[in-house]
């Protein structure tokens, strides 16, 4: 079996990381400015992060949210206090695509609508609804067309305000 061809690959085999650098299999060092998948904003192999992850992995690596998990409750409490939104609910998920997918569903539940504004050249993930609001026809399959999407130019605030005010009665949300 081979890996699915998702992106054209750079000819770099990254084998380790430390701090803000990654290293390839030839020993070359690169400043890691990647801002995509599963970004580790504390840097690679940060000692505190490694210590806490190792401790947790030695206790329980994962379990369903269908049972009480005091760590999740503690996290929600801390985030609520730190953000000033302690009367909100925290929905823990796995990825940005899943976050986008569920934000679209929550907006649709709330508005009862299914038309969304997204922005040109955007990428929101590979789940079905996230693909539908991604401005890349190459990855949108017929099954993804479950709601209408209008693409507007990124950073054209006037066009966005005009469209959203004119179409407010039709819109589920603006991504």
Question: Where are each of the predicted segments found?
Answer:
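Conserved small/polar residues in nucleotide/adenosyl-binding loops
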Residues: 163-168
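Extended, polar beta-sheet/loop recognition surfaces of beta-rich domains
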Residues: 171
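Short, acidic, Ser/Thr-enriched surface-loop or helix-capping motifs
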Residues: 24-25
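Hydrophobic alpha-helical segments, chiefly the membrane-spanning helices
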Residues: 174-175
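PLP-dependent aspartate aminotransferase-fold enzymes
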Residues: 77-162
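Short secondary-structure boundary/capping elements
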Residues: 14, 45, 71, 152-155
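Glycine-rich loop-to-alpha-helix module at the N-terminal edge of alpha/beta enzyme cores
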Residues: 29-113
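Active-site-adjacent loop/helix segments that line or gate small-molecule/cofactor pockets in enzymes
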Residues: 1-21, 56, 78
């Amino acid at each position: 079996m081979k890996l699915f061809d998702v992106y054209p690959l750079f000819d770099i085999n990254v084998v380790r990381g430390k701090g803000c650098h990654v290293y390839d299999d030839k020993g070359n060092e690169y400043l890691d400015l990647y801002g995509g998948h599963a970004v580790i904003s504390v840097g690679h192999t940060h000692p505190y992060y490694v210590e806490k992850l190792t401790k947790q992995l030695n206790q329980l690596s994962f379990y369903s949210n269908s049972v009480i998990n005091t760590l999740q409750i503690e996290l929600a409490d801390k985030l609520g206090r730190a953000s000033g939104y302690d009367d909100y609910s925290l929905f823990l998920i796995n990825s940005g695509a899943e976050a986008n997918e569920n934000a679209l569903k929550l907006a649709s539940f709330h508005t009862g609508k299914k038309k969304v504004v997204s922005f040109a050249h955007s990428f929101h993930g590979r789940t079905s609804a996230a693909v539908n609001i991604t401005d890349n026809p190459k990855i949108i399959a017929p099954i993804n067309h479950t709601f209408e999407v209008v693409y507007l130019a990124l950073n054209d605030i006037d066009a966005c305000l005009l469209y959203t005010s004119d179409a407010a009665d039709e819109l589920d949300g603006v991504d």
